[in-house]
């Protein structure tokens, strides 16, 4: 059903690896840009019903490739949405909504794909993965085999 999502199985390909968080059950491997591993998580705010987009980049450090939340785009004001920028962050008006620029380490990067939120992983090449179709349980997302920065 999702054959077009799977990257060819090569040992050194830069990939996002999605597994069930508690069991480790493999769900999918997705090819990434090895020089700039990044992906967006798009979803519908559970209370407001408005779109939210979280942008993540993976950076190499001594503990491996780890996700950093670098931007959040949203409309409206509601539970879980920022109302002000924290230290080192910038909250900017962006059309009808807002854009929060930040650099927050998210490790481990785990998402529970609630059906009402229609959580989607969006890759740079515009591939979209509906997370709730992969599993109803918490999903861990990690980058593997990407090129070290030069």
Residue positions per predicted region:
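N-terminal secretory signal peptides
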Residues: 11-76
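Mature, soluble, non-transmembrane domains
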Residues: 64-69, 77-150
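A short, compositionally biased
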Residues: 8-14, 113-118
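Bacterial N-terminal signal peptides
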Residues: 1-7
């Amino acid at each position: 059903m999702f054959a077009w999502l799977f990257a060819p199985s090569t040992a050194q390909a830069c990939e996002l690896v999605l597994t069930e968080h508690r069991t480790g059950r493999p769900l999918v491997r997705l090819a990434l840009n090895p020089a700039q591993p990044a992906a967006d998580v798009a979803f519908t705010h559970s209370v407001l019903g408005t779109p939210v987009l979280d942008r993540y980049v993976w950076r190499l450090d001594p503990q491996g490739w780890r996700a950093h939340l670098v931007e959040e785009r949203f409309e409206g004001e509601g539970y879980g949405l920022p109302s002000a920028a924290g230290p080192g962050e910038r909250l900017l008006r962006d059309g009808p909504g807002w854009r929060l620029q930040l650099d927050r380490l998210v490790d481990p990067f785990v998402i529970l794909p609630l059906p009402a939120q229609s959580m989607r992983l969006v890759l740079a090449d515009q591939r979209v993965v509906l997370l709730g179709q992969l599993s109803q349980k918490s999903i861990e997302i990690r980058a593997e085999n990407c090129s070290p920065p030069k």
